[in-house]
Amino acid sequence: MSDINATRLPAWLATCPCAGDDVNPLLTRGE
């Protein structure tokens, strides 16, 4: 699932910058 999240990261940021901020901390912790 982590792989899918990382691939969708760029799409989320481009679609919703607000969501990217929320996912940023989550990604940093997951990585």
UniProtKB/Swiss-Prot annotation:
The keyword DNA damage does not apply. The keyword Translocase does not apply. Keywords: Thioether bond, Toxin. Processed by the macrocyclase-peptidase enzyme POPB to yield a toxic cyclic heptapeptide. POPB first removes 10 residues from the N-terminus. Conformational trapping of the remaining peptide forces the enzyme to release this intermediate rather than proceed to macrocyclization. The enzyme rebinds the remaining peptide in a different conformation and catalyzes macrocyclization of the N-terminal 7 residues. There is a cross-link at W12-C16 (2'-cysteinyl-6'-hydroxytryptophan sulfoxide (Trp-Cys)). InterPro entries: Amanitin/phalloidin (IPR027582). One of its GO terms (molecular function) is toxin activity. Residues 1-10, 18-31 form a propeptide. There is a cross-link at A11-P17 (Cyclopeptide (Ala-Pro)). Belongs to the MSDIN fungal toxin family. Major toxin that belongs to the bicyclic heptapeptides called phallotoxins. Although structurally related to amatoxins, phallotoxins have a different mode of action, which is the stabilization of F-actin. Phallotoxins are poisonous when administered parenterally, but not orally because of poor absorption. This is Phalloidin proprotein. It comes from Amanita ocreata (Western North American destroying angel).
